[in-house]
Amino acid sequence: MTVNVQFRFRSGLPLLAFDNVRLRGSWDEQGHPSNDWTSVPMQRSRDEDGYDVFVIRVPFPDDEIGTHFRWGIELGRPGASSLWAIAGELDDEASSRRERSFDLQQGIGPQTYYLTWIGRLGANRVEKSDAADGIRFSVWAPNARDVLLVLADPAIGYIADDGTGAVATIKMRRTIDGFWIAETGDDDGLLDFDSMVGTPYMYRVTKDDGSLAYRTDIWSLMQIGAGDFDPDGATYHGSPAALDGPQSCSVVCDPKRVVLPSGQELAAEVFWADEFVGGRKLPDRLEDLVIYELHVGALGFGKAAPGTLDDAITFVEHLSALGVNAVELLPIAEFETRANWGYGTSHFFAADQGAGGTDRLKMFVKVCHQRGIAVILDVCYNHFDPDGERAQWAYDSNDHTRNIYYWYEGNPGDYADPRGGYIDNISTGWAPRFDEEAVRQLFISSAAFLVSVCHIDGFRLDQTSSIHQYPVLHADGRRADRAAAFGAKFLKQWTRTMRLIKPQLFLTAEDYSDWSAMTEPSLTGDGLGFDATWYGDFHHNLVEYHGGAQAQLLKNAGFGDKRALTMSSFAGALQTSARSKVVYNQSHDDCGNREGSARTAVIAVNFAPVVGETRAWAEARSRFAAAMTLLSPGTPMFFMGEEIGAQKPYRYNDFLENRENILGEADGDGAGMISCYRDLIALSIHQDAIRSRNIAIPLVHDENRVIAFHRWDDGEDFLVVGSLNDAPFEHGYRLHSERLGDDLWEEIFNTDAHKYGGWNVGNGGGRIRATAGVLDAVLPASGVLVFRRL
């Protein structure tokens, strides 16, 4: 007698280029335990959600009933013939093993590995061969006594605590994994999928203590609200558009269709058919990127409301003219209120409706791709929306230990304040429960959705140090080592899944731990799998860091005296930038939000009014900072507005009042600065030597405020010479380096050129002969020169 066990591998994603998918298990060909794992091919099939599933049935002898077996999935894809597809590690903080297991039993059910949970939760299409496709609603609420699906009045888009706004309630049934499900056929109110598209809904959850709560669908693709108003449970009779998105109803959406601004609907494959035109290609290596950091909400100059994705679509022409090949958006997933940076996400699949929603995000991506610009999204997984009363907070229980989305240690009675068991991590909210697969999959699956459905090219993860290094107990600040360990496990699972889905994704992290594992492989190793980490010390040495010991070159130059500058300290940061770093002269955090910070042009003159001669110095030093960033061996990035010499502070609480007219200034007072940026970007992108990681720094002089560094690759050689001296070296500055040889060097770039607004001090684009490693060159005040070896 045998016991047949079905094994299933489900990605939750369409048309992944997986091949040779194989089941590997700790048994021999007869089904007996073996240390030499067998490998058998799995058959590709299609599940009812319309996605690939790989299936195999394996017979085991019944005399092995009770035996513990282990298994996993191996697959191939273009460029890699054998990849281990189990992304998540065992729920043991001391183990990094990636495998699944079961005890053989008579009548055992299917053993399934879900790479992502797309299609398992939310409102999803159910394909039917003999009728119109149905719909399935599914919600994770393991502690609930009961859950009802509540359909809402689309003219209101909100359900009050007393049920006002509901038009139908539908019973849901519980599954063994804590899901609650309702689908077509369960109730007359559940029609076919297409008929349900656009329907607003919520869940009425009876918690474990019997209390009732209305909850949004955490896996929804759209929240109906596009405004700021929170009824706070009271009856609401206003417009759905005025509601704050996280508090409003979720909406059934069809990810296989795109709604254009005109209202016309297109099949996704039709919409994306002209994604790449005229032979334009996207960059495919992180080192080839020049990243423009953009906050959509800070666009819309001249309007009272925050900027939208429509404004961003218009802005792409500016990005294209500037020459950048990547744009990084501050978080665009659903967040509270309109005027917000977006770092408190409530619904990770839904682009903020106030910004235009998911279909507008797709349009933005397509317009960028048509111009050869990759799109990177900033995502925040270290905390949830702090005002998550209808989202993650206390979703199905008021018991702190059963607050399913949040990490909690011990019992409420252990602390003077019952909240003491939550985890602080130097973010604006408590840490997620990273030891729970449903929580991990919320982050993993939403990222997979953005890649597969919205064609996103990469991600920047906000403050990953908060996930794997900073966790402490809220009660007393004790280290929460288990929370940190599972945070690291989550990050590895996330990067592994992304690499399986799309190996060429750009994966960067804001991380200040200096942990080398951050940029070591995760899919083929035990690292955390990121391409690069943000390098804050580059900015701190180059521009400023209030109270810090770093060089702060521009800040100290801004005093206007002749003090020495620690160019040597910046040289160390410049050298380190070659080690898998994203470097920036400014980021969103550094333009005024942090104490002592401000726009580069303001820091460069020590907060003096940027007018007249002072403006000339502000711009000269700003051009120096731009050149150091864009010519470094790191991956360069700068924040919106730097290219026009923006001066107004960019702060969390008043960015709307301080928006800069970037498009207007580009043809006005910012024309010289933008011309300099444009030429620097072209030099950075089109010269392999500049985009290589190769750097040598043969000359640093703190008293003279001079630095020179060499960039090279495959026969190309460039010498970059920068000076922050307040006077030019008009009679020449002698550079010594054996790297200069006896060769001829041609000046190909000068930040002090008239066309950039400079004083035009330099070598006139001439050629200078080095002799025995010595080269004499005229250096401008607060300027940067680039020479090419001939």
Residue ranges and their predicted role:
Residues 1-8, 93-145:
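Non-catalytic, glycine-rich low-complexity segments
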Residues 13-65, 75-100, 138-198, 206-229, ...:
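Aromatic-rich carbohydrate-binding modules that target alpha-glucans
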Residues 139, 203, 294, 319, ...:
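Conserved, mostly hydrophobic/aromatic
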Residues 219-221, 266-286, 295-483, 494:
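Substrate-binding/active-site clefts of carbohydrate-active enzymes
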Residues 230-296, 548-614, 765, 771-777:
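Glycine-rich phosphate/pyrophosphate-binding loop
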Residues 481, 489-653, 685, 692-695, ...:
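Conserved alpha/beta catalytic core and glycan-binding cleft of carbohydrate-active enzymes
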Residues 662-697:
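Aromatic- and carboxylate-lined catalytic core of secreted/periplasmic carbohydrate-active enzymes
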Residues 762-790:
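C-terminal beta-strand-rich structural cap/linker in extracellular carbohydrate-active enzymes
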